[in-house]
Amino acid sequence: MNYFLIFLTLLVAVIVEKIEELVAIRFFSSYVLDIARMEAEIEEYKELSMLAMLSGDREAYRGFQDMMNEIYGRVFFRKISFFTPLYFLLLSPYIVALQFLGVENSLSIVLPVAVLYFSAKLFYGMVRDFVKSYVDYRKANN
């Protein structure tokens, strides 16, 4: 039963994430567009800092990195403060349904699985971005 419940919870976590994206775009489109605009700025500063690094201009590189980090901090905390409560608000009917079905400690199963899912997704995104940056750097050096 526990393995089935863990798999079901993982499946529900993925589905709720997709629902969260739809709800955010539908009801909070200006907020989502503002975050997307700031993420585009981060990518622009990332490219500019890479060009500055390749040209040997350390001051420009540090300046672009500082500007990129400042925007990234705002984006990160905006995403965390908005999307995390929205996600768990949308996940709460599943938790309540498990309680009504008689699954004991449903919160202690759902919460770790959801956190583990998002941690793995975040780690994958970080590794993917690192590899992409490394490949871009290697292409620019050759």
UniProtKB/Swiss-Prot annotation:
Keywords annotated in UniProt: Cell membrane, Membrane, Transmembrane, Transmembrane helix
This protein's record includes keyword Membrane: yes
Taxonomy, superkingdom: Archaea
Gene Ontology CC terms, in alphabetical order: plasma membrane
Location(s) in or outside the cell: Cell membrane
Topology in the lipid bilayer: Multi-pass membrane protein
Chain segments annotated as transmembrane: 75-97, 107-124
The name this protein goes by in its record: Uncharacterized protein AF_2124
Native species: Archaeoglobus fulgidus (strain ATCC 49558 / DSM 4304 / JCM 9628 / NBRC 100126 / VC-16)
